Amino acid sequence: MKTSTIVRKSFAAGDMIRDAGLKTPEDVQRFDDIVYGEDKVWQSLDVYRPKATNIEEKLPVIVSVHGGGWVYGDKKLYQFYCMSLAQRGFAVVNFSYRLAPESKFPASIIDTDLVFGWILDHAEEYGFDTENIFAVGDSAGAHMLGLYTNLCTNPEYAKVYKEKFGIQTPQDLKIRAVALNCGQYHFGLEEMSNEMTDNLMKEFLPEGGTPEELGLVNVDTYVIEKFPPVYL
């Protein structure tokens, strides 16, 4: 049995218990299932705002990158967490992205980039303050967000991704700060000796985790001074 299958079954059982009986808070306004790419299922997002605010009122933005070992999860599983952030005065963007092994790296990074571009393009429509964009990532989402933040701040790293994958982050995007929860930020010999990590990387990466591939997804290697403030 694939590791991704095991992860999906085990994680789903716990998530169902956690979310049982939860409902949308009365003080949150939500805009659901907005398609940001070609895949209407996996490339979709929700926007949550405090209901007491007018849509014309620009609010600071929090972008949530969900976890799930790169192989599991979607925006539905993080909706209640994200709505709790909206209750604190933020416009929150909660998105699904394409998962491995069906969609190999860099699909999830491409999707993350599309979402940030979508935010800039729809700032007026949804009341986003693009001068105050923050982001949170959980587990695999923390790894992806760390990687993406490197692409936004490290020109040499960004050049590699542009040449290899055609990814180019929006020039006018500035992420003010990030919060990274329970992520893995380096994939060396010690880390890859963990059977689950090794198996997940084999499903996540197109060539199964060659040294070159692992080097490209190491977050800590490419952090420079321009990296924004981070809460770990």
Residue ranges and their predicted role:
Residues 1-232:
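Alpha/beta-hydrolase superfamily serine-hydrolase fold, recognizing
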